[in-house]
Amino acid sequence: MKKIRNFEEIRNVEQAVLKSALSLFPASELVKAGMGASPEVNRLLRKMFPGIDYEAECRRISAVRIEEVERIHAEIVRTVNNWHD
């Protein structure tokens, strides 16, 4: 599997691999990651995890610091890249 360099590149990862890797993260972290992502990546996350109520979770979280979003993005990239090493 080709390594990804940033969170936006998750859209290029095989869906089965991506879903397995992302399943390790709590819903709140997936929603926070989506807060700093493109509309395309947000659609991908919502499609992969239809059981997450993104709107309700966003209201519950309210505001999040960009540093936290960046930390979650980096952790997701690391997890995806290490998934099949």
State each model region's role.
Residues 1-85:
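General marker for long, soluble alpha-helical cores
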